[in-house]
């Protein structure tokens, strides 16, 4: 099963355009600009076609895209995760451009069975503490401006510290003018728990009880697909609960990597590092693409497939498990608009739990697989598109798609 995480909004540096990242037409394929979601759907279509072709050529040594009854017309499961801000736009986009949420029928031209997994986890932004602001502005590395500009910046920072102290450090951030910006997604760790909380995983396992593996990836990892060779490698190392894909690190790769802590190899998030320049010691970057063995992961949550019918038990198990993972506090700017072109920008604090921290748990059996950059590199900013086009990454993505 192909699991695409699309919780992001206001990303790919849309300069405040409010675009859902998954729906951003970032590059031209087949003579037409395609969105991130279009690319991932077309990759699923190509994967199923290749499996069918191999199945026809070699009936004994191929990977079959079949159901329990042996039918060869059975689309690849493609689950798209959403948040409270992205669910409706993505649902409307699929209805307009991909004939809705395609089901498993003989006339399914997309060769994929697309489902939406609606996010059930949400957070409320808070007023940061003065200590948080001082750490962000005074203790972390910052560019020094010319004397006059630096005075203006220091004055503005001082005013924001006074605002945080007067409003109430650590209190809830509330803005009646734009209530949605008071809420925030709580990190991509919750994408898998959301599958259980909203019943998506339960329904999929009931429809296809032979399902054993999930492949989780970010929407901006455009080269990730269900590669039969990688899947075979994952199955061969059958003891792993999670298999993370990593890529050779380059200077622009920020956000964490593969490291060794207390003689244990694990993923280290950038937010967990004491200094920003510590990230430069990593040789491998975390692509966030993860192969998940379903039953073993459920066992780590103290659950089984049959337990997924009990919503209260699932919620309690997930809540207890989440307490074992670190929680990060990040500062995010929000705009308070007063009208007539006047607005103020305030820093707010939000908390996040990150999926890669699953590797920090001692009982979590994790393996790590080095893959080429064309498969694991992420597109975070439009400035990356030129290099992405020139180094052959775009050509590789086009070769694994069927538009």
Language-model features and meaning:
Residues 1, 10-356:
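Domain-scale recognition of functional cores that engage charged ligands
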Residues 6, 84, 372:
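Residue-level signal for short, function-critical loop segments
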Residues 320, 324-403:
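Long, compositionally biased intrinsically disordered regions
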């Amino acid at each position: 099963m192909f699991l695409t995480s699309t919780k992001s909004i206001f990303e790919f540096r849309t300069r405040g355009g409010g675009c859902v990242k998954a729906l951003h037409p970032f590059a031209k394929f087949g003579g037409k600009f395609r969105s991130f979601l279009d690319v991932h759907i077309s990759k699923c279509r190509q994967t199923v076609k290749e499996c069918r072709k191999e199945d026809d050529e070699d009936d004994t040594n191929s990977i079959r895209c079949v159901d329990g009854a042996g039918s060869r017309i059975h689309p690849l499961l493609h689950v798209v995760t959403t948040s409270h801000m992205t669910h409706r736009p993505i649902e409307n986009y699929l209805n307009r451009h991909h004939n809705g949420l395609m089901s498993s029928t003989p006339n399914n031209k997309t060769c994929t069975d697309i489902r939406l997994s609606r996010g059930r986890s949400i957070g409320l932004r808070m007023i940061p503490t003065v200590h948080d602001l001082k750490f962000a502005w005074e203790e972390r590395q910052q560019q020094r401006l010319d004397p006059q500009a630096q005075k203006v910046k220091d004055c503005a920072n001082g005013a924001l510290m006074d605002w945080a102290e007067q409003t109430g450090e650590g209190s809830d951030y509330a803005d009646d003018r734009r209530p949605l910006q008071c809420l925030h997604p709580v990190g991509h760790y919750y994408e898998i728990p959301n599958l259980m909380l909203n019943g998506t995983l339960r329904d999929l396992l009931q429809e296809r009880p032979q399902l054993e593996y999930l492949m989780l990836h970010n929407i901006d990892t455009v080269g990730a697909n269900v590669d039969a060779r990688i899947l075979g490698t994952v199955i061969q190392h059958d003891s792993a609960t999670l298999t993370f894909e990593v890529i050779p690190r380059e200077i622009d790769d920020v956000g964490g990597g593969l490291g060794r802590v207390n003689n244990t190899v694990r993923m280290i998030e950038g937010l967990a590092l004491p200094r920003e320049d510590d990230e430069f010691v990593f040789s491998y970057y975390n692509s966030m693409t993860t192969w998940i063995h379903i039953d073993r992961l459920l066992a780590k949550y103290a659950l089984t497939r049959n337990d997924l019918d009990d919503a209260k038990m699932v919620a309690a198990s997930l809540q207890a498990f989440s307490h074992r993972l670190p929680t990060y506090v990040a500062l995010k700017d929000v705009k308070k608009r007063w009208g007539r072109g006047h607005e103020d920008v305030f820093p707010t604090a939000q908390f996040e739990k990150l999926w890669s921290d699953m590797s920090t748990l001692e009982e979590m059996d994790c393996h790590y697989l080095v893959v080429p950059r064309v498969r694991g590199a992420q597109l975070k900013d439009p400035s990356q598109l030129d290099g992405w086009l020139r180094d052959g990454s775009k050509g590789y993505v086009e070769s694994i798609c069927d538009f």
